[in-house]
Amino acid sequence: MSLKLGVIGAGAIGKEHIRRCTQVLQGATVVAVSDINADNARAAVALPGVQAEVYADGHDVINASDVDAILVTSWDPTHEEYTLAAIAAGKPVFCEKPLAMTAEGCRRIVDAEMKAGRRLVQVGFMRPYDEGYLALKKVIDDGDIGAPLMLRCAHRNQSVGENYTTDMAITNTLIHELDVLRWLLNDDYRSVQVRFPRSTSHTHARLKDPQIVSFETKKGTLIDVEVFVNCQYGYDIQCEVVGETGIARLPEPSAVQMRKSASLSTAILTDWKDRFIKAYDVELQAFINDVKAGQLHGPSAWDGYAASVAADACIKAQGTSEPVEVTLPECPAFYKR
């Protein structure tokens, strides 16, 4: 039986998820769509194969009798509101990152979900579903390079618009590393420090770019993440793990190597959707399967909360040259099942 999905938010990622659920994945049908811009919603339901009703409001989607589960892909500041409403309605909800705009907002979602008595929330962190990250985690978990001592990572975007500000390098960009590195290392952050090198000429007045974000984990691993969102040359994700007995690197995306015109070259992707397109597919298929099976297993509301606690510390660290403590409470037993 097909799982009936309601999608709140039909912008870039929402429209892509509607296409994905309709044309690529199995076991789900999009039956309801809303967006603050009605043209976005109408464009989404006009995609080949989509047969969904357009609603004026996200709450109407949540309360629709024919909707079994919710995808929240709306404007970031609305995520908490719609996720809480889905929990109150007893409907499983896949919420794109960030789960909420603050750690306090994420904690409200955690508390509401625990009060509901079962996991209803999956956060849209797709990197744990990426083949490269899964392979890298297996190397670490199997002890092939010994205990992880240091990580060197980079999150580079070709360019961003003038509405992108210094704090968004944390809340919209680094947020993925904040989640996936906890998962990769099975560890939490102890402290964070942010440094600003010489700024690129391709940035604007409200954005300091690049940034170097340095963490110490509770097990003592040191992590440096370069966030450079106007790198010009492409979309580039790097992760190198230095262990006691060896070094492991995140594999590069598969690409044809060319020898031409006295040069040796390999193309670099420019679109984040292309870099993790398979991971997005696997992530949403897992959500669909888990909802139908009655038990969610993907990134939880607690994972969203943990990433937000770290993000808040990073933003605080942007305003000082000193390390800032990352204070994450003990994970409740509810999320350790």
Curated annotation (Swiss-Prot):
Gene3D superfamilies: Dihydrodipicolinate Reductase, domain 2, NAD(P)-binding Rossmann-like Domain. The lineage of its organism: Bacteria, Pseudomonadati, Pseudomonadota, Gammaproteobacteria, Enterobacterales. Involved in the oxidation of myo-inositol (MI) to 2-keto-myo-inositol (2KMI or 2-inosose). Homotetramer. HAMAP family: IolG. Keywords: NAD, Oxidoreductase. Belongs to the Gfo/Idh/MocA family. Its EC number is 1.1.1.18. It comes from the Bacteria. It catalyses: myo-inositol + NAD(+) = scyllo-inosose + NADH + H(+). SUPFAM superfamilies: Glyceraldehyde-3-phosphate dehydrogenase-like, C-terminal domain, NAD(P)-binding Rossmann-fold domains. One of its GO terms (molecular function) is inositol 2-dehydrogenase (NAD+) activity. GO terms for biological process: inositol catabolic process. The keyword Metal-binding does not apply. PANTHER family: INOSITOL 2-DEHYDROGENASE, PTHR43593. This is Inositol 2-dehydrogenase.
